[in-house]
Amino acid sequence: NIKMMDKKQQIWYRWKNDLPKLKREAVDILSRTYLEIGQKPSVEDIVTMANILVDDLANNTQFSTMTIEDVSRAFREGVRAGDEASVFLNVRTWNIWLRAEKKKVAKKVIEMHKKHELEYLENARLMGGTIKKAKQIK
């Protein structure tokens, strides 16, 4: 269920307005992911990687409009995809996962816009018929 995205949920907005919470959420995503794939980095490494992740998200126009939920889903699905990229968590791996998620989100948004366009055209057609009938009543 894709809804029109609130800009306040997008990474770029949160980076400008709530960076500490965004970084904490990145730490949570990375901690969960490291656990799921069996890597055991130090807390310092997780925090460093979280800073790199947030920087990647905020400064890559492809990812800056994503939400933290999109990012979390990308990591969750990336781990479970079972391909060679899911063996280790690193910058290259998460960029692969994020690009895949961004494509899925973009496809859903396009489908939603097409659906709304078809609904609009159908409503316009029905309204045109109603107006035509109303004119005939005169």
Q: Which residues make up each language-model segment?
A:
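Charged interaction scaffolds used for protein-protein
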Residues: 1-138
